[in-house]
Amino acid sequence: MIRLKNRFGKANRKEMSWMSDLMETLRQEGISPDLLCAVEEYRAAHPLAEALRPRIPAPAFVYYGREVWEQALAALLCGENLLLAGGKATGKNVLAENLAAAFGRPAWDISFHVNMDAASLIGMDTFVDGTVTFRPGPVYRCAQCGGFGVLDEINMAKNEALAVLHAVLDFRRAIDVPGYERIPLAEETRFIATMNYGYAGTRELNEALTSRFAVIQMPTITEENLEKLLRAQFADLTDKYVHQFALLFLDLQKKCDSAEISTKALDLRGMLDALRLMRRGVAAGPALDMGITNKAFDSYEQGLIRDVIAARIPASLTAEKLFR
C-alpha cells in the first residue's frame, strides 16, 4: 500500500476531488481500464443521499497490488461479497476502506468479538421517551442505505451469532427482524469481511458462511511496496534507510514464519510509529523498542527481536543521519 501524499481526508477538499485522485492513482498502477470504467458507471448509476456522504471513507492510504485490486473490483461489480483472508500487515482493512471509497458508498465498520450476538448486528429494542423503539444495528443500516459493511475479524465471533448473516449474504439478500418486518437489501449493498486465520481467539468459519463469500487470499507486502510506503510516508528518509527498514520488516517476517518469534513484533504500524518518534528526536533503539520490541512481553523474545533490529539499524542512530 502507498500513501496518497496528503490528498485524502482534508476538510477543505471536496469529495469528488479525492475520489478522482484515487481513480487516477489506480490507473497509474495499471488497474484494468474496463474495470475502472465500470466502477465509475456504477457510481453514476447509484447516487448517494447527501446525509450519507460523510460516511464515504476518505482513506489516508491506497492499497498497492494490481491483481488483488482487479479481483476485488470484479467481484463487487458482480454483486459478490468479499472475504479478505491473510496474515498481519497485509492491508486487509486498507483495501476494504479503499473499495468503499472507490465505489463511493457509505461504510459501516463492524468489529467482531466473542460476545457478538445477533442483536449487535441487526438491532434491538430500546426505550425512547418511554416508548419501545427499534434501534437499528450496523447491518440493518447498511442494508437500508446501500452501504459497504466491513466485517472486521469475522472469525472472532461465534458461528451462532453469524447465522443471522446467512440470508443477508446469499441470493435472498434480506433481513428478517424478529417482531418487525422483512427488510430487503438495497441493490448497492455489499459486505467485505476480513480475517486472520489461526490467531488466538479465532474460530473456523463454518462452510455455510464461507460459501457466501468470494475469498481473496491477501499476499504479504513485498520489498518494493514497502519501500514505496516508506518513501510516501517519510519523503525525507534517506535511500539507505528506506532500504534498511524495508529489509528489517522482511527479516522480522522471516523470523515469524519460522516460529523463532511471535507475530507481535511483525507490526508495520509500529515501525512507522517508531520512525515518527525518531523524527521527533528519539534515538533508534528506544524508538524501535516502543514501536516493535516491547510488544513482545517475554524478555527472551525481546532479545531475539533486538538482535534482528541491530543487524540493520544501529541503536544510536539519530534523526540527523536518518533524514535528509
Cite the ranges covered by each PLM segment.
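C-terminal regulatory/interaction module of P-loop NTP-utilizing enzymes
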Residues: 1-324
